[in-house]
């Protein structure tokens, strides 16, 4: 049997996901300072960072939606 949907902790989980993604983004920015990276490696990191930024925006929008649903 499937577990019931407990939405009470969704905001907290989403906030943790935002924080983790921000930390990954910051680490990637530090990695970009490495002069031994190839152009392809640098490009891959920058593309991944764009996706991370999009994820952060999406997570924050979900947080707003979840918060409004709870109140």
Swiss-Prot record:
Domain of life, source organism: Bacteria
Biased composition (Basic and acidic residues): 39-56
Region feature Disordered, mapped onto this chain: 30-56
Pfam families from the UniProt entry: Tlp
Entry similarity comment: Belongs to the Tlp family.
NCBIfam families documented for this protein: SASP_tlp
HAMAP family in alphabetical order: Tlp
Name of the protein this chain belongs to: Protein Tlp homolog
Species, as recorded: Desulforamulus reducens (strain ATCC BAA-1160 / DSM 100696 / MI-1)
Gene behind the chain: tlp
């Amino acid at each position: 049997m499937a577990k019931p949907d407990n939405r009470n902790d969704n905001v907290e989980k989403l906030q943790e996901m935002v924080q983790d993604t921000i930390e990954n983004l910051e680490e990637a920015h530090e990695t970009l300072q490495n002069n031994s990276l190839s152009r392809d490696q640098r490009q891959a990191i920058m593309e991944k960072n764009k996706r991370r930024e999009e994820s952060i925006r999406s997570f924050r929008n979900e947080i707003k939606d979840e918060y409004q649903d709870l109140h």
